[in-house]
A protein has these predicted regions:
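Histidine/acidic-rich helix-loop-helix segments that form or flank divalent-metal centers
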Residues: 94-102, 126-129, 182-251, 266
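Short amphipathic alpha-helical segments and their helix-coil junctions
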Residues: 1-7, 111-121, 211-223, 275-281
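Hydrophobic alpha-helix feature that most strongly marks membrane-spanning transmembrane helices
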Residues: 118, 122, 142, 147, ...
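Glycine- and charge-enriched loop/helix tracts that form the active or gating conduit
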Residues: 1-139, 146-185, 288-302, 306-319, ...
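Terminal helices and disordered tails flanking the catalytic cores of nucleotide-processing hydrolases
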Residues: 204, 244-337
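Active-site lining segments that contact anionic ligands and/or coordinate catalytic metals
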Residues: 134-138, 143, 191, 231-239, ...
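A short alpha-helix capping/helix-coil boundary motif
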Residues: 38, 48-52, 152-153, 243, ...
Length: 337
């Protein structure tokens, strides 16, 4: 890959060309001509003069095109990443526990994860433009551990911890993607995926209600209808699988999660409510923490297949209140719905 004519002159005309040079190098696995590379290094800090929208488009094309890990690494080596995504650049040198991450530090793990993107085909049931789905997964992969550097700590026994790094990373992703002028719904979707990316690690202990709530989540940037209704959890599964393969390599949790999700009948994650807030108001339960907690308790029991009728739900609600010594008028059992 070489600039036409004088690379300094070409990059002076439009600094975005340094990102395009890196994208072409990654896409075709071509080396960058030494003179062009020197000019890229010279203009790296000037990339900040380019509008965030144009930078976003090039970064997105790097992540969704062939060999995204090569492109991401070139951004790091050139110094461009430190300008446009300093939060990601800080992953380098953040060591991890080798039993879970034999591949190395957080940066190395992220590059390995990005290299696996090409092995993750777009979900076959996806309707619409597949590039949008690719972008969601790609940005979630690129930023899924961005919260590790600020949460890194070492215990007295020498083990490294990154407590709540997924929540920290989700918040950071909002800042990063907002800065890059991504659409609001896209930002929310990527942030949610990052916040949830560790949840399937507990799939063997996960209650049915918790799993069904996860399955019931939707992508705000896509219509929630037909075969799209489980697109969020399908994307989360792909992120989880990539994360595992880029670290210790085990897929036991992924396989179990996939099997449990596939076994759910359509609509199991969002069954009709057995009772509503109106029923609780009839008990004189005021709107507030108790009201909200009781509705959730009934819904959890329903999702765990412990309740299936309105009569049972009313009895459950009455017992729940009695156990807590709450002095409300009890509901009168109604007919089964």
């Amino acid at each position: 890959v070489r600039a036409i004519g004088d690379p300094v002159a070409r990059f002076s005309e439009d600094r975005l060309r340094i990102l395009r040079a890196i994208r072409f190098s990654a896409r075709f696995s071509f080396p960058i001509e030494p003179g062009t590379w020197e000019a890229i290094l010279r203009f790296a800090t000037a990339i900040g003069d380019v509008s965030q929208e144009r930078i976003r488009e090039e970064l997105d094309r790097i992540l969704t095109g062939p060999h995204p890990a090569e492109g991401w690494n070139l951004l790091k080596r050139s110094g461009i990443l430190a300008v446009v995504l300093p939060e990601a650049e800080r992953m380098e040198g953040v060591e991890q526990n080798p039993e879970f991450h034999p591949e190395g530090d957080v940066w190395t793990h992220t590059l390995k994860a990005l290299s696996l993107l090409e092995e993750e085909p777009v979900v076959s049931t996806l309707e619409g433009d597949p590039s949008q789905a690719s972008s969601l997964l790609a940005w979630a992969v690129a930023l899924h551990d961005v919260g590790k550097p600020p949460t890194a700590a070492i215990r007295e026994d020498g083990r490294r911890t990154f407590y709540c790094h997924e929540q920290a990373g989700a918040r950071m992703a909002v800042v990063i993607l907002t800065r890059l002028r991504f659409p609001v719904h896209f930002i929310e979707d990527v942030s949610d995926l990052i916040a949830d990316h560790m949840r399937l690690a507990a799939i063997f202990q996960m209650k049915d209600s918790t799993l069904k709530r996860l399955v019931g989540k939707t992508l705000r940037s896509w219509p929630d209808s037909g075969p799209m209704s489980r697109y969020y959890v399908n994307t989360l599964l792909r992120l989880h699988r990539i994360d595992c393969l880029a670290s210790y390599g085990g897929l036991a949790e992924y396989d179990h999660a996939r099997a449990r999700i596939d076994a759910l009948v359509p609509g199991a994650e969002k069954p009709p409510r057995l009772i509503t807030g109106r029923d609780l108001l009839g008990m004189k339960v005021p709107r507030g923490p108790v009201y909200t907690e009781l509705l959730k308790a009934v819904e959890d029991a329903q999702l765990n297949d412990e309740l299936s009728t309105r009569t049972g739900a009313l009895a459950f609600a009455s017992a729940w209140l009695r156990e807590r010594n709450l002095d409300f008028t009890e509901l009168v059992d109604g007919d089964d719905a």
